[in-house]
Amino acid sequence: MSLLYHKQNQELSSGVRLIQDVNASNSPMKYTAVKVLEFSADSSYEETLEAFEAGIVVLEGKVTITADDQTFEDVGQRTSIFDKIPTDSVYVSTGLAFGIRAKQAAKILIAYAPTNQTFPVRLIRGNIHQVEHRGKYNNKRLVQNILPDNLPFADKLLLVEVYTDSANWSSYPPHRHDHDDLPAESLLEEIYYHEMRPKQGFVFQRVYTDDLSLDETMAVQNQDVVVVPKGYHPVGVPDGYDSYYLNVMAGPTRVWHFHNAPEHAWIIDRQ
């Protein structure tokens, strides 16, 4: 089974298009799933969560989100993903229904993780994101943490946005988090939702294990998804194009501890 999922662009309902729907039924992922929707003006979507929690991330535009008798209006902070403004999200717990209504065009990512635990519905405004500039040389990226492991707002879900400029690498040097060996390393699946600027661009992503029993290198296009059930997973961005991806992570324990590939760890220590 390939780890690369191309854009679907399927009409789901009036004014709502399904761009991605990656889950346990069509992928090797057990702990993570993702859905990406594009809304025309005056369109809506509803869903009921059963044995899953969800993080609803407003990638572009503004929407109204309802869940558990709560209504959040004007959720969203940017007209384009590449505005690089931290956006708004809503966390919804298992057993609840939610609705999304768009007065204008919008793009939404819904991240899922299986759980039987309940947490309060929560609006996560972009202005509380932990923003980091990581790396040096040609290994620089902008990181916007939506739902990191130090915010106790979810049972399993971790969410983060990463911007990588032209001719840089990210998720690099290669690291993995597929061993349940805390505190050294946590077992977390990971899903990448990719976009590029300009849209005709592509990035390269390699997913591989130490023994190379898994070793897949992909040319990833705009709005593609890459799933990482295990292994290292670096991303390279060609000259002339900028990269965005949103990471969905989940596993047995909601902690992100990773292991760098030892043969490439020297890259971190360069002066």
Curated annotation (Swiss-Prot):
It catalyses: 5-deoxy-D-glucuronate = 5-dehydro-2-deoxy-D-gluconate. GO terms for molecular function: 5-deoxy-D-glucuronate isomerase activity; glucuronate isomerase activity. Keywords: Isomerase. Transmembrane segments: none annotated. GO terms for biological process: inositol catabolic process. Pathway: Polyol metabolism; myo-inositol degradation into acetyl-CoA; acetyl-CoA from myo-inositol: step 4/7. It is an enzyme of class 5 (isomerase). Its EC number is 5.3.1.30. Gene3D superfamilies: Jelly Rolls. InterPro entries: Deoxy-glucuronate_isom_IolB, IolB_Bacilli, KduI/IolB_isomerase, RmlC-like_jellyroll, RmlC_Cupin_sf. It holds the Pfam family KduI. Involved in the isomerization of 5-deoxy-glucuronate (5DG) to 5-dehydro-2-deoxy-D-gluconate (DKG or 2-deoxy-5-keto-D-gluconate). Belongs to the isomerase IolB family. This is 5-deoxy-glucuronate isomerase. It comes from Lacticaseibacillus casei (Lactobacillus casei). The gene is iolB.
